[in-house]
Amino acid sequence: KLEPGEPIAIIMDQTLTQDATGTMAYLQLEAMGVDQVQTELSVSYVDHNTLQSGFENADDHKYLQTVAEKHGVLFSRPGNGICHQVHLECFAKPGKTLLGSDSHTPTAGGIGSLAIGAGGLDVACAMAGRPFHLRMPSVIGIELKNELRQGVSSKDIILKVLQLLSVKGGVGRVMEYFGDGVKTLSVPQRATITNMGAELGATSSLFPSDERTLEFLRQQGREEDFEALEADPDAQYEKVITIDLAQLEPMIALPHSPDHVCTVREVEGMKIDQVCIGSCTNSSYHDLVSVGNIVKGKHVHKDVSLTVSPGSRQIFKELADNGTLSDLIEAGARILECTCGPCIGMGQSPITEAVSLRTFNRNFYGRSGTLSAKVCLVSPETAAYSALCGELRSPLGLTYEVPKEPAFMKSDRAMFIAPKPAEEAKDVTVVRGPNIRPLPVNTPLPDMIDKKVMIKVGDNITTDHIAPAGAKVLPYRSNIEKISTFVFMNNKADFHDCCKENGGGFIIAGANYGQGSSREHAALSPMYLGIKAVIAKSFARIHKANLINFGILPLTFTDESDYETIDEMDELRIEEIGSIHPGGKLSVYNVTKDC
């Protein structure tokens, strides 16, 4: 029944994984006993854990390469690029469904693909040919009118949407873009917008497939993949938001949330210490050539460190061929590998108390690797101009050459390793280094839980809070026992020890608990530590699904004021758990407070 809130199931045409979440997904696929994936296409990307300071990441990559060869999955080698940028260039198709073990999978919505982020177990099930289950989302229509002025970018569009809707405004919804302004945006510009639909909490974001889509597919040598798609003339939306692109100006998300948005003009002049340009949000050809044209013949301010991370090897090669790479180097930029890098705290942590301008999608507390840093999200144009000035500056009115897209861009298909044919695949040995640990197995929930509250947290707790990333933690994504020692490390340093001493217990949370990435480690690790239930005012979609997948009860307060009556280390009791059903009620008795 295609009505908002009703359960539905979708068969997925394509899947993608990245290495920080992929090892778990393929361990789960192996545990299912699946010989060959059942999708039209499944791709395993390596773009997160590329800082090889120990054997762990390299071991994970070898596991991913060999398990892909054995089970029919295409493998994208380290250095080939960020999964969403490469998938957009090489594989995403209008009208196809895509499920990815990364929350920014909806990037492909920029080409007209229904793309959804999910936990690794859901992606493993999709690879096994099983449908993806969710509740039918409602649809918000976003009408784009007119055309952007020079110095204003598609990043400013999505920051404006975040300002209007907040980080929970998209929960249970799909964002659908339409209007005469759509045709003024290229596919990569549209993909910037759909990418950050994840920050809205949206299930997906979608643009029509039109002549600009065909233009992009021709550029990539994939014209045969084109299919025209647009909303029905009588399409009905939950609500419609109209944005006049001609009136939009450069925007900025201030610390520590992507919806803490204002105009650059309102905070212009703020001294900055670091500028990082790249990520799956803003590392396209148009983005980076714009940056190159702004800094050409000039030099980065003496107090600013500027890094640039191309989104793919294809883009990196184009920058080298057209002279942009030379312009960036001469301007003082530090050129990084085609990976996620600083966006996930994998290197380039800023100085203490730094103000870091980043073209990324998230500025959560501590995500950069420096707890005291003030990370702000801006467009590539704002970032580049500010890097020259040493302070936040609006590029509105700045004169620079607007990039012209090449007619054709070549992909290096040698950076992909094809899976073995089914008969040969049987002989492939999957390589498992010592960092590849078996999946932890939960026990069935008892009919009664009597445990203490291990931690109480507020609103908008992210998966970065629950299961931090960064260079020190990410190498252990294949080792749940080890990575569990880092759970809530920046909120409650003794959380791990407290869980061990008490045999686990409860988590109490505010609204939008678990927003952010799709990392199922934010459910797996608490499960390993004995967490039986999370009681919150509300949940983010992907994290709630991950909690269910790993046997942790996601319970929502019927009366939000009850949140105030519970404290850390209170003993709570829940009975008759076996009677639970969707929409049903359970009573929680506070033994400590006798209420």
Model regions and ranges:
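Fe-S-dependent hydro-lyases/dehydratases of central metabolism
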Residues: 1-595
